[in-house]
Amino acid sequence: MKPDQVLLQYFHNLVDMDKALSYVHKDAAFIAAFEKESDRHHFYGTYYGIEGVRTLLSKFQKDLYTQEFEINKVLADETTALAWGRFKHRIQHTGKIFESYWAVVCDVEDGKIKYFRGFEDTGALEAAFLID
């Protein structure tokens, strides 16, 4: 499977965590906005391996109610895929909307995502989690 197909299958299967994780390399590194953990937001940091990505996806499932997720374009070569689009999530504990354009770069090895880095409006993310 080509890198763009792997990334698309990962995205399409996010509703079933185990299926999505079947596209994650055992030595994966997934970066959620920033490499290092931060007190600015509990999503931030680098998540390693399948269990690390499971931890990240569990955080998303607990906190985000996806209302819209659009993929505008995916580009790829033999080992890398780039994608961008937009999403809208309702934050479970605040009820606020987090809406952003997003971009992802990933490297694929042996048909699985080995490196994944996501980019989004982190200011909007942090604001949506603030309790008024």
Model feature map: region roles:
Residues 26-73:
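A solvent-exposed, acidic/Ser-Thr-rich amphipathic alpha-helical stretch
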